[in-house]
């Protein structure tokens, strides 16, 4: 099923290699989601991407986000260095792009989980995957069930409520 829905994720790359960073903002900025899942601070995600890039020879970092304008507002450093915002327009495009990353910093959302799973299980070369911990704002027993053994956890830092405007107020 997956191969039929996102065939490019399983084909040889045609674009230059990159590291993927996924930042879920959008509805995570709303009060109803902030206390349950909460947005991870985008500057932390960029820093983790930068560390992966340095570790692996300086490949560019491609940011996948549902809120490019908010991400750029929160991370002005995005205009310098080897960063780019993905032009993926659908969830399938984003999933494909993230799964093709040579290393990947996940967000706490199932789209990220599936991209990391596909990258880890279907790529011939090992893929460094950094997974957020805890997955929810409040740690849960499920946190131990989510990662694959080869994934590395990173300690989440939540985006402060004052850092971004609530999209429903715009």
How should these model regions be labeled?
Residues 1-51, 55-56, 161:
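Secretory-pathway luminal glycosyltransferase catalytic domains
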Residues 4, 14, 57, 129-131, ...:
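Compositionally biased, intrinsically disordered/low-complexity regions enriched for serine, proline
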Residues 44-48, 86-90, 108-111, 154-159:
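Glycine-rich loops and low-complexity Gly/Arg-rich segments
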Residues 53-139:
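Donor-binding and catalytic core of enzymes assembling or modifying cell-surface/extracellular glycoconjugates
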Residues 137-170:
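Leloir-type glycosyltransferase catalytic cores
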């Amino acid at each position: 099923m997956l191969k039929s829905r996102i065939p490019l994720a399983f084909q040889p790359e045609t674009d230059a290699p990159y590291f993927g960073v996924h930042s879920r903002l959008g509805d995570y900025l709303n009060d109803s989601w902030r206390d349950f899942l909460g947005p991870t601070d985008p500057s932390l995600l960029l820093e983790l991407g930068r560390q992966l890039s340095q570790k692996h020879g300086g490949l560019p970092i491609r940011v996948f986000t549902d809120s490019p304008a908010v991400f750029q507002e929160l991370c002005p450093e995005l205009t310098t260095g080897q960063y780019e915002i993905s032009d993926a327009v659908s969830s399938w495009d984003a999933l494909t792009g993230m799964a093709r990353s040579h290393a990947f910093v996940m967000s706490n959302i199932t789209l990220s989980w599936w991209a990391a799973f596909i990258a880890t299980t279907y790529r011939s070369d090992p893929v460094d995957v950094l997974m957020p911990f805890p997955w929810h704002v409040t740690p849960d027993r499920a946190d131990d069930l989510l990662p694959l053994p080869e994934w590395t956890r990173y300690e989440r830092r939540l985006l402060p409520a004052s850092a971004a405007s609530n999209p429903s107020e715009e």
